[in-house]
Amino acid sequence: VRPYLVAFYESH
């Protein structure tokens, strides 16, 4: 999993 995708998913 990409870090930026994780950040986006977690931030949502």
From Swiss-Prot:
Query: How does its activity depend on thermal conditions?
Result: Optimum temperature is 50-70 degrees Celsius.
This chain's source organism reads: Pleurotus ostreatus (Oyster mushroom)
Q: What is this protein called?
A: Ribonuclease
Q: Which GO terms describe its biological process?
A: negative regulation of mitotic nuclear division
Physiological role:
Has ribonuclease activity towards yeast tRNA, polyadenine, polycytosine and polyguanine, but lacks ribonuclease activity against polyuracil. Has antiproliferative activity towards L1210 tumor cell line with an IC(50) of 41 uM. Lacks mitogenic activity towards murine splenocytes and does not inhibit HIV-1 reverse transcriptase.
Q: Which UniProt keywords apply?
A: Hydrolase
Give details on activation and inhibition: Activated by Mg(2+) and Zn(2+) ions at low concentrations. Inhibited by Ca(2+), Cu(2+), Fe(2+), Mg(2+), Mn(2+) and Zn(2+) at higher concentrations.
Cite the GO molecular-function annotations of the record.
Answer: RNA nuclease activity
How sensitive is activity to pH?
A: Optimum pH is 8. Active from pH 3 to 9.
Q: What is its EC number?
A: 3.1.-.-
